[in-house]
Amino acid sequence: MAGSAGEQTISGYIQHHLTNASVGEGFWTFHVDTLAWSVVLGLVFILSFRAVAKKASAGVPGKWQACVELIVEFVDDTVKSTYHGKSALIAPLALTIFVWVLLMNLMDLIPVDFLPTAAALIAGESMDVIAAGQSHTYMKVVPTTDVNMTFALSLGVFALMIFYSVKIKGFGGFMKELYAHPFNTPWLYWFNFILELVSLIAKPLSLSLRLFGNLYAGELIFILIAGTLGVWQLPIHFLWAAFHLLVIPLQAFIFMMLTIVYLSLASEEH
C-alpha cells in the first residue's frame, strides 16, 4: 500500500506539472500559460534584437551584439544555401522561427518547480499547501511542450507553403502538381492526388509533432527526476540539462531548416 501511495503521489506530481493553466471548455479552451509565455518570449526576442540594431557600431562589437550578429549571419547563410526563390521574406521569417523556438525551448532548463511554485504563491496559496501537492495553480512554462503551440507554428508554415505555391505557379499549376505528379497519366490522376495530398498534409504534422515530442519528453524526464529523487535530483538534473543543451538548439534549427526547405520547394517553378 505504501508503494501504491508513493506511485499516486508521483503520478499526481507529474500530472500537475504537465497540466496547462486553462480558461474555457472544449474546443474553445485557451492555454493561458502557453499564450503568455510565447508572447513574453516573442517580445524578448523583438526588443533585444531591436536594441542591438539601434546600438550597433562599426567598431569592436560588444558580447551581445557579437552574439546577435553571429545568429543573423548563420541564419542568412542557411537561407542563401537552401532557399532558391526570390522572396525577401524568408530570411526574416527563418530568423524569427529559429530564435523564438530556441527561446521557448530554453525554458525547459528552468527548474521544474520554480515558476509553478512562484505562480501558486502569487495566487495566494501557502507553502504548506504547495508542499503537500494540493496546489490548484497550474503553469507549464515551456510553450513547445504544448502540442497546440507547435501545431499553430506548423500551420503558419503550411499556410505560407500554399501561398507561395499558388503565387508562383498559379492555382492551376498548384493543382496540377497534386494530380499530375509523380505519374503524368490521366488514369492515375486520382492516385497521384491522394498520394500528394497525404504528403502535403504530412509536412506540417511531422513538423509540429517532432518539436512537441522531443521537448515534451525532455520536460517529462526533468519532472521525473525532480519527483522521484528529491534532494538527490541536482546532480542528475544538471547532467540531463547538459545533454538537453544539445537537443534544445538542434530542434529549433531543424524546425527552421525544414521550414526553409518546404518554402523553397513551394517556390520552385516547373
From Swiss-Prot:
Disulfide bonds: none annotated. InterPro entries: ATP_syn_F0_a_bact/chloroplast, ATP_synth_F0_asu, ATP_synth_F0_asu_AS, F0_ATP_A_sf. It holds the Pfam family ATP-synt_A. It is a multi-pass membrane protein. The chain crosses the membrane at residues 27-47, 90-110, 147-166, 182-202, 211-231, 238-258. It comes from the Bacteria. SUPFAM superfamilies: F1F0 ATP synthase subunit A. GO terms for molecular function: proton-transporting ATP synthase activity, rotational mechanism. GO terms for cellular component: plasma membrane; proton-transporting ATP synthase complex. GO terms for biological process: proton motive force-driven plasma membrane ATP synthesis. This is ATP synthase subunit a. Gene3D superfamilies: ATP synthase, F0 complex, subunit A (1.20.120.220). Key component of the proton channel; it plays a direct role in the translocation of protons across the membrane. It comes from Pseudoalteromonas atlantica (strain T6c / ATCC BAA-1087).
